[in-house]
Regions:
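Residues lining hydrophobic/aromatic ligand-binding pockets adjacent to catalytic sites
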Residues: 1-136
Length: 136
């Protein structure tokens, strides 16, 4: 819900509240990630996720950093602000393994599906093994 004193237009757009749903019928705004703890206080309510944000170590370009990731149910609050979400983790691993068994990505997408509303929209990034092959 927009904060008291927000300037809403007729579609409910409130940029000061980071609400970008309904800007225009031909425009959908979203991001390429959704569980970013840096958005606490803007997209996500701080109190809702207190004590529920684990940390994990990531390595990029030889440098290690700590990342905090919100729980997957935060996607419900994400879609209060945006209409579309690009899922980029599908780039790194297929949905099924070589034996046809569901991978972790498959199970994670199934969980996202349980949490989506009727007007929420996902875009899946094509796996690199399919699309980003190196030419020899």
């Amino acid at each position: 819900m927009p904060e008291e004193g927000s300037m809403l237009d007729r579609n409910g757009f409130a940029p000061e509240d980071f609400r970008f749903r309904g800007l225009h019928p031909g425009l959908s705004v979203g991001t390429a990630s959704d569980r970013y703890a840096g958005w606490l206080g803007q997209i996500y309510s701080r109190d809702r996720y207190a004590g529920r944000i684990p940390s994990r170590q990531n390595k990029v370009g030889g440098r290690t950093f700590t990342e905090r990731v919100l729980p997957i149910d935060s996607v419900r609050e994400y879609f209060e602000h945006f209409e579309v979400l690009e899922i980029d983790f599908t780039f790194y691993r297929l949905l099924l393994d070589e034996d046809g068994n569901p991978t972790q990505n498959h199970h994670l997408l199934a969980r996202y599906r349980e949490l989506l509303g009727e007007s929420d929209f996902l875009i899946l990034k094509v796996p690199q093994v399919v699309f980003a092959r190196k030419l020899q």
